[in-house]
Amino acid sequence: MNRFIIADASKCIGCRTCEVACVVSHQENQDCASLTPETFLPRIHVIKGVNISTATVCRQCEDAPCANVCPNGAISRDKGFVHVMQERCIGCKTCVVACPYGAMEVVVRPVIRNSGAGLNVRADKAEANKCDLCNHREDGPACMAACPTHALICVDRNKLEQLSAEKRRRTALMF
C-alpha cells in the first residue's frame, strides 16, 4: 500500500505553513526569500471554509487514475508514491481531469529552449504538479514537519488500520 498524507480538519488552522514548506522544499536553494508569485507552486493546498480549514493533497492511489490516463506514460508508481517524470510530461491536463481528489494540477514553468538556429530562447513549459511525499528529503514530507498544529499525518497500512479501529470503537460506544 502506498503511503499518503491526510489532514485532520479539527486541528488545521488554515495558516498555509504547509504550502510554504512544500514550495521551499522543492526549490533548488530552499530559501523563502526567493519566493515569488510565479514560483509559489505548492503541491498541497489549504482549503478554507466558513468554519473549517483543511489541506488537500495527492492520495498516492494504488491504481492511480492520473497514471492510467497519461498518454505519454509520464506518471508512474515509484518507491511507494505516484511520480511524475517531467521530461515526459506534455502538459495535456488529462491527469487533472482524472484525479478524483483535485490534487493534480498543471503549472507553467519558464524553460530555456534551443531555437534550432543556435539561439537559446525563453519559453514556458506546462507540466503536472503533485505531491511526491518529498522523496528528496530524508526527514520525510516538509509540510508535516512544518505544520504548527500537527494536523498532517502520513498514513500507511498500519496507520490506516489503527484509524479504522478507532472509528469502529467510537461508533460502538455511541450506542
UniProtKB/Swiss-Prot annotation:
Family matches, as InterPro entries: 4Fe4S_Fe-S-bd, 4Fe4S_Fe_S_CS, RnfB_subfamily
Cofactor note: Binds 4 [4Fe-4S] clusters.
Positions that bind [4Fe-4S] cluster 3: 58, 61, 66, 99
Residues at which [4Fe-4S] cluster 2 binds: 22, 131, 134, 143
GO molecular function: 4 iron, 4 sulfur cluster binding; electron transfer activity; metal ion binding
Superkingdom of the organism of origin: Bacteria
Protein function: Electron transport from formate to hydrogen.
Protein name: Electron transport protein HydN
Gene this chain is encoded by: hydN
